From Swiss-Prot:
Membrane topology, Cytoplasmic segments: 1-8, 124-134, 190-228, 299-306
Source domain of life: Bacteria
Gene name of the record: gsiC
Chain ranges of the ABC transmembrane type-1 domain: 95-292
CDD domains membership: TM_PBP2
Protein role: Part of the ABC transporter complex GsiABCD involved in glutathione import. Probably responsible for the translocation of the substrate across the membrane.
Coiled coil: none
Record InterPro entries: BPD_transp_1_N, MetI-like, MetI-like_sf
CC terms in the record's Gene Ontology section: plasma membrane
Protein source organism: Shigella flexneri
Sequence similarity: Belongs to the binding-protein-dependent transport system permease family.
Protein name, entry field: Glutathione transport system permease protein GsiC
Localization of this protein: Cell inner membrane
Length: 306
């Protein structure tokens, strides 16, 4: 197992290098001139050229790439073109709000999604199944930005129960986490149901029932563990999606996180911040997939990695 983990970690190096090259080329292909945006609409050509020199944009593209890669290897992603603060500080100040929002969304989505999926599988083709799957399909189909605006209108504007802007208290997390986790809970419910339906028809489940084991114990002990392997895969992918895909939700709720920072950076063509954030998201997905693979062995001891 240790050899497998080390091998996967070493595989990060070429993957992140390829991502770095693609991201660098992508951000420099974006339309618009960062120097013009920073200098302002009233700036003349001389001022814009001076800003370009200060930002290093007057140098050849290969020279900019080498400077970017050599510094990134040392953990230095440069200065933000907009705030002139270190990119690492910009990301660090926004990371925790996004992480806590992701964890909050994932916790309730897993609890309610798995519960709905198990109920739908146990009472298959009956009203609990139909009700759960109808809600799940609705959750998948409803756009996150529309759900967010609907929740703001009802619970903040009309009722005045919950705040909409900021991340200072636990009340601020309720509406964004509901919005962000709705689609994940819906996918979790459908995935859990499909996995449980297959498990419930296995021979060992019928054997447990024949031995007089209660249906609740059969479902929770024998069914849940064996149905968890594909569900854990989906959980890992969804967690990475939440962590890196909260852009729309953060924009709707003006959340001080990485998603909003990325949107603002794209609008201002802040190349260093864009490159660092996409690299961070790529690293998160790779590490989450590694954790999921390791969890396989914990859930099912029959699985071993060589």
């Amino acid at each position: 197992m240790l050899y497998y983990v080390i091998k996967r970690l070493l595989g990060l190096i070429p993957t992140l290098f390829i991502v770095s090259v693609l991201v660098f080329l992508f951000v420099h292909m974006l339309p618009g001139d960062p120097a013009r945006l920073i200098a302002g609409p009233e700036a003349d050509a001389q001022v814009i050229e001076l800003v370009r020199q200060q930002l290093g944009l007057d140098q050849p593209l290969y020279h900019q790439f080498w400077h970017y890669i050599s510094n990134a290897v040392q953990g230095d992603f440069g200065l933000s073109m907009v705030s002139r603060r270190p990119v690492a500080d910009e990301i660090a100040s926004r990371f925790m709000p996004t992480l806590w929002l992701t964890i909050t969304s994932m916790v309730w989505a897993v609890i309610f999604g798995m519960a709905a999926g198990i109920i739908a599988a146990v009472w298959r083709n009956r009203w609990p199944d139909r009700l759960s799957m109808t809600i799940a399909v609705s959750g998948i189909s409803f756009p996150a930005f529309a759900l967010g605006m609907f929740l703001i209108q009802v619970f903040s504007v009309e009722l005045g129960w919950l705040p909409t802007v900021g991340a200072d208290s636990w009340q601020h997390y309720i509406l964004p986490s509901l919005t962000l986790g709705a689609a994940v809970a819906a996918v979790m419910a459908r995935f859990t149901r499909a996995s449980f339906v297959d498990v419930l028809s296995e021979d060992y489940m019928r054997t447990a029932r024949a031995k007089g084991v209660s249906e609740t114990w059969v479902v929770l002990k024998h069914g849940l563990r064996n149905a968890m392997i594909p569900v854990v895969t989906m959980m890992g992918l969804q967690f990475g999606f939440l962590l890196g895909g909260s852009i729309v939700v953060e924009k709707v709720f003006n959340w001080p996180g990485l998603g909003r920072l990325l949107v603002d950076s794209v609008e201002m063509r802040d190349y260093p911040v864009i490159q660092a954030e996409i690299l961070l998201f790529s690293l998160e997905f790779i590490l989450i997939n590694l954790v999921v693979d390791v969890l396989y062995a914990a859930i099912n001891p029959a699985i071993r990695y060589k």
